[in-house]
Structures are given as C-alpha cells and as structure tokens.
C-alpha cells in the first residue's frame, strides 16, 4: 500500500502504451519504462533553473518512422478527471517528422532501430524550350528603331511605312537628325515609280497641314528629301512635285479666305506651312550657292493680300503669325530687289486697325506687329565695327588691370615699362594660383592653394554689423 502512495498517480499506466499522455509520450517527456515523476526526479541530475521560466524537457523522436505522407493515430488514454479549462482527450493524428530523410537518433537502447526511409520527390516535366518564340507582355509595342531596321519590307504598303514614320516624328521630333538618313535610304529602295513619289508628297503635305506642330518638321523633311531622293521621273523630282501640290492649294486662296470656318482653318495651315517651306527649303545653284525659292516669296506676298482683303479675326491672326515668322527675311529680300512691299503691308495693317470691324485683341496684335517691325523685327546690330583694344587706341586699356607692389611697397601696373616682365609673371601666377593676392602673398597659407580651403567665415564685427543690418531691414519692411 505504501508502494501505491509512493508512486505518482498515473505512473504505471503508460508502461504498456509507449506513447501515453501521462507516460513517456512526447508531450509528457517521461521515461520509456513508465517511471513516474517521483522516480524520474530521483534518477535525473539536478538542472539549473532558467531565470524567469522553467525550461521544458526535450521531446524525443518516435520509435518508428511512419511512411512518407502517412499519419498514425494514438489511442486516447483512459478517462481521467479533467482539469478546469483542459481540452478533452481525443484521437490525435501525428505527422511524420519534417526531416524524414535523415536517420532518427537512438533514444532508447531497448527499442529497435527503424531503417531510414528516403522520400523521393516527384519529377516535374518542364514545358519550357530554348527554341520557344520570344515572349512579349500584353500591350507591348516594339520600339521605333526595331520596327524600321528592315525598312518598308515589314509593312504591307509604302503609305503605311511613311505614315508610321511621320507619326513618329510628330511624337518625337528630336529623333529627326538620327533617323532621317536611314529613312531616306529606305525610300530610295522603295520609291521607284511616279505614283509612289506622288503618294509620298501627298502624305507629307497632309501631315504638315493637318497637324499644326508638324509644319516646321515637315518643311525640314521636305528639304532633306529634295536633296537625297535619287528618283527623278518624267513628271518631276520630289521638290517639283511638292511645289505643284502647294500651287494647287494656292490657286483657290481667295475662295478659301472667304469660306467657312473649316475651310479657312485648312487654308491657314497651308499658309503657315508655305512660310516654313520658304525658310527651310534650300535650292543649290550651279556654282554651289544656296538660295531660297523665289516662287515661294511671290506666293507669300499674294497670300498676305488675300488675308488682309478678308479682315476676319482668324484671317488677321494668321497674317500676324506669318509676318512674325517670315517678316524679317521677306523684307531683306524685297530690299535687295528695291521693292517696298513691306511698307505696303504695314500700311494695310494700319488701315485694318482703323477701319475693320475686328476684335480689340486682334487690333492689339496688329499694333504689336507694327511695333516689332519698327524695331527691325527684334534684331540688334552693332553700331560700330569691333576693334581689338590696344594701349594705343584705348585710353582705358590699363584701367581694369590689377595693381601689384614691390617688396619695398612701391606700386606698379602694366603701364610701367620697368616692371613689364615682373607684371606678366605675376599675372600668370595669378591665373594658375587664384589664392594669391596682388603682392604675391598666399592667402591660403603654406599649404597647397588647390587643396586648402580659405576660411570664409565672417569676423565677429562683420557678423554683428550684418545682424544689425538684417534687423533694421526687417523693421523698415514692417513699417
């Protein structure tokens, strides 16, 4: 009976189960032979207590390893009075240890050692291939340089290739210099008939007149192609076909200036494009000189007459834009020929301001244009010919030169003939060593003037005076 009291409750119940809750199961941490807590305490050496908490005993591994992926069930221990808050004991599945490929360390000499089992991972067959086509995400568009490397061969028609290039220049005008040469070479290989050349001219003209910001870029493109396209059919080369297309629009100028709003808007775009062509289209003479197209000069004069003859606000605004763009060049060209066309245009502007029923803002624009022309179109010319200053022709030649001092304190300048060599030497030293004063004293001390920094902090007196100045300025500002 005393043995029953000496033995802890439940100590013998786990003897035959191996994995009981009160015995040597992983949760209990007891001996394999079913010894109770009292007997276990006598056999184990005293363990030092961890500060603040009790360290639980280590969990031992199961005696046998279940098959990979299998679960084993542990029967519940006999019913015992449940503790308050304790969960009811049920059959609990136990998972295999995570490192089932390793050998299980021996915990009990009496238990048989199970053979280690190796889990073979299933082999996944990949569908990837080195010969698969290149992957592009949805919405990806190839860059311009890639799409134009092979020329127009990747496009169904020549018009699609040219239109794509024009749209690209509209969005990225800075790429003109780097890509125009390749574009011209491609056109030389694709444009081989009269119809293809006529289609090219029409595409460029429509782009330049339908998109306002493309008129300047379109004029530059026309100038480049007029010099680099080699095709010259019986109907005319690129420049001749371009001028013929502009003449077609020019011949209906009077009707367009009187037309509806849509017609006038299209006519104004043509006028500004013709002005850009006059400035950018270069014609090389027989002796290599570069001139402008005189036929465009005559056309611009007649277009101005058509605009001022129909003094509506949008017509007058278009005339102002054209004169701001080409006024100085037109006036110089007319003066060389002894013509007074610009004087006549200015007189017509003054008459419009006095008599026409245009808006106040448009009249103000016309007056600003007259003022701009009176200031020579904003150009500034030197009043006298530049001459290099010398001691002979400039009395103030030595005024801004620095003054140096000898070791005796005698000042000398570049005008002193006795010290010219010494003066030049000091000037050269000052250029290479800016930390030197006029008398050759090194401001930065004995160190390297290139490496040593000059202490630029203010003196206490200067700092105090500066603070007073700031306070005084703040006081005056608040008054």
Swiss-Prot record:
The organism's place on the tree of life at top rank: Eukaryota
Region described as PABPC1-interacting motif-2 (PAM2): spans on this chain: 116-143
One GO BP annotation of this record: positive regulation of cytoplasmic translation
Chief location: cytoplasm
InterPro entries: ARM-type_fold, MIF4G-like_typ-3, mRNA_TranslReg/HistoneTransl, PAM2_motif
Stretches with biased composition (Polar residues): 98-111
Modified residues (Omega-N-methylarginine): 21
Region Disordered, annotated ranges: 1-114, 435-455
Keywords: Acetylation, Cytoplasm, Host-virus interaction, Methylation, Translation regulation
Region (PAIP1 middle domain (PAIP1M)): 157-375
UniProt function note: Acts as a coactivator in the regulation of translation initiation of poly(A)-containing mRNAs. Its stimulatory activity on translation is mediated via its action on PABPC1. Competes with PAIP2 for binding to PABPC1. Its association with EIF4A and PABPC1 may potentiate contacts between mRNA termini. May also be involved in translationally coupled mRNA turnover. Implicated with other RNA-binding proteins in the cytoplasmic deadenylation/translational and decay interplay of the FOS mRNA mediated by the major coding-region determinant of instability (mCRD) domain.
Descriptive protein name: Polyadenylate-binding protein-interacting protein 1
Lineage of the organism: Eukaryota, Metazoa, Chordata, Craniata, Vertebrata
